[in-house]
Amino acid sequence: MGLPWYRVHTVVLNDPGRLLAVHIMHTALVSGWAGSMALYELAVFDPSDPVLDPMWRQGMFVIPFMTRLGITDSWGGWSISGGTVTNPGIWSYEGVAATHIVFSGLCFLAAIWHWVYWDLEIFSDERTGKPSLDLPKIFGIHLFLAGVACFGFGAFHVTGLYGPGIWVSDPYGLTGKVQAVNPAWGAEGFDPFVPGGIASHHIAAGTLGILAGLFHLSVRPPQRLYKGLRMGNIETVLSSSIAAVFFAAFVVAGTMWYGSATTPIELFGPTRYQWDQGYFQQEIYRRVSNGLAENLSLSEAWSKIPEKLAFYDYIGNNPAKGGLFRAGSMDNGDGIAVGWLGHPVFRDKEGRELFVRRMPTFFETFPVVLVDEEGIVRADVPFRRAESKYSVEQVGVTVEFYGGELNGVNYSDPATVKKYARRSQLGEIFELDRATLKSDGVFRSSPRGWFTFGHATFALLFFFGHIWHGARTLFRDVFAGIDPDLDAQVEFGTFQKVGDPTTKKQAV
């Protein structure tokens, strides 16, 4: 049978045994990829600096997903939080990778078995002897089992009743750790940033799934609905399954890009909106103001800012700064962060404090403009020096550092002041090592960006797949020219439309 490449799946259309076999093989491939990718990432991951070189800076993709579900330790003796461990047990990064690979192998063998032994009694209709599946019943079974898994995850794993809990952090991604979460049953459970909503929603959705599954197992669909929605056709299952998958893909693309309790910034990096809104900058200034109110000096107040918080307030960690086709981790772009130089405070010769206007997300270059606290431009780095009025040299701008490695250091020579003014456009200033990885200095996106792009793209493609297969199954008789309710034996070639006596062909 010479099938074109896009029609090859028709070989399992009326063969339930081999349809099952190819799905088991698909599960083997997915699980095998996950385990293999985890082992590869563990081979290249450097856990030595969780503050300035976290997993998302190194381009880790599957390690964050394991971590948010409660895996924190490695057989290599390290912990994701930076400490050391002596007995991580089976539920370590390597243990999870190994279980996926073992499961993949078992699925591989099961797929071969079902491909060879395809003609099982369970797949044949005892009345007709032909292969058939009771699709509404199978739907009920799967819905029930999915409900049990969903309920179990929310009630046991997330709550810590029987499981580790999940990764929970503060709003600024500083204190994250794996902990048990109590379900949030009030209105706060609908806040996407409240971890308790994860537990309560899984419990509620799981309960609904169990009840719906039992309903579909005990109640048969009405005949008119069964025929109208083509419930006996396997392509109906394909179409509705694709719908479920593309809907889920759109949802997770949104929760990843805009941020939520399920995508902590410690594991996936900050969102672009935190840069756009000056989210971390405002928190840093709030902490400094509180320090000054407690009679700390400016230097002492800035020195109390956690390096982790300062690092979030750097444009190189904005996932929207990386081009879609720039391969590699963030570390391959601007380099590996080594240390925070400190916060630069600029002043003109009249003693006014000046603030460098920060670069918006979608700019690659941006004019260096320094404004005072009222937003009035007081200094800049001009494009044309001949017409400049506010140049650093003319205004006499100086810079002094507070906190970080350059704490207490000040510069007045224009070249150095301009250098740090340019770097201040990008947020807090860090020393970056570009030599180790031969980093090219061009920003890369974080796994947050890749995940969003991949899932949004595939969701769109799968949406079209849903429309395609849904139309094929609903209008199959129209496309084929055969009435599905036609019981009479028909002769191909007698009529222009098969089985329709009103279209009898004329003898030539």
Curated annotation (Swiss-Prot):
GO terms for biological process: photosynthetic electron transport in photosystem II. The chain crosses the membrane at residues 21-36, 101-115, 140-156, 203-218, 237-252, 457-472. Keywords: Chlorophyll, Chloroplast, Chromophore, Membrane, Photosynthesis, Photosystem II, Plastid, Thylakoid, Transmembrane, Transmembrane helix. It is found in: Plastid, Chloroplast thylakoid membrane. Gene3D superfamilies: Photosystem II CP47 reaction center protein. InterPro entries: PS_antenna-like (IPR000932), PS_II_antenna-like_sf (IPR036001), PSII_PsbB (IPR017486). It holds the Pfam family PSII. One of its GO terms (molecular function) is electron transporter, transferring electrons within the cyclic electron transport pathway of photosynthesis activity. GO terms for cellular component: chloroplast thylakoid membrane; photosystem II. It is a multi-pass membrane protein. Binds multiple chlorophylls. PSII binds additional chlorophylls, carotenoids and specific lipids. One of the components of the core complex of photosystem II (PSII). It binds chlorophyll and helps catalyze the primary light-induced photochemical processes of PSII. PSII is a light-driven water:plastoquinone oxidoreductase, using light energy to abstract electrons from H(2)O, generating O(2) and a proton gradient subsequently used for ATP formation. Belongs to the PsbB/PsbC family. PsbB subfamily. NCBIfam families: PS_II_CP47. PSII is composed of 1 copy each of membrane proteins PsbA, PsbB, PsbC, PsbD, PsbE, PsbF, PsbH, PsbI, PsbJ, PsbK, PsbL, PsbM, PsbT, PsbX, PsbY, PsbZ, Psb30/Ycf12, at least 3 peripheral proteins of the oxygen-evolving complex and a large number of cofactors. It forms dimeric complexes. This is Photosystem II CP47 reaction center protein.
